[in-house]
């Protein structure tokens, strides 16, 4: 669908998320969330607002992400990563980017960040084929 998908599942802290966001110039749909480790999502406010990032928050961190960033970004909330990928697929326009850079642990739905990343890649490929 002329959207580029990036797997940064290893980004389990906010500094890593900010570094990933700063790697791109194109508009970003950011998949953020997972197991809430008490991260300081406020640190994302400035960059999210400046770059007009759309956020799809998922997992146990989704509600806190929403409360912290709702006035800085357009947000979608869901429980599962698969649903977050589906939403991203629907709302991201050609020429834009979907970035999985969760800023949270993976243990709520996956064994580790590697398994989460593999799941992300497989799900994106499944949408591309459909």
Can you name each region flagged by the protein language model?
Residues 2-4, 9-130:
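ATP-dependent carboxylate-amine ligase
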């Amino acid at each position: 669908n002329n959207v580029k998908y990036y797997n940064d599942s290893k980004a389990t802290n906010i500094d890593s998320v900010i570094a990933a966001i700063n790697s791109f110039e194109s508009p970003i749909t950011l998949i953020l969330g997972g197991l809430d480790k008490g991260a300081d999502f406020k640190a994302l406010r400035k960059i999210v607002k400046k770059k007009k990032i759309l956020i799809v928050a998922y997992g146990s961190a989704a509600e806190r992400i929403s409360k912290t960033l709702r006035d800085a970004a357009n947000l979608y909330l869901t429980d599962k990563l698969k649903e977050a990928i589906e939403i991203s697929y629907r709302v991201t326009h050609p020429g834009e980017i979907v970035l999985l850079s969760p800023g949270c642990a993976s243990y709520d739905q996956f064994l580790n960040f590697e398994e989460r990343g593999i799941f992300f890649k497989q799900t994106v490929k499944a949408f591309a084929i459909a």
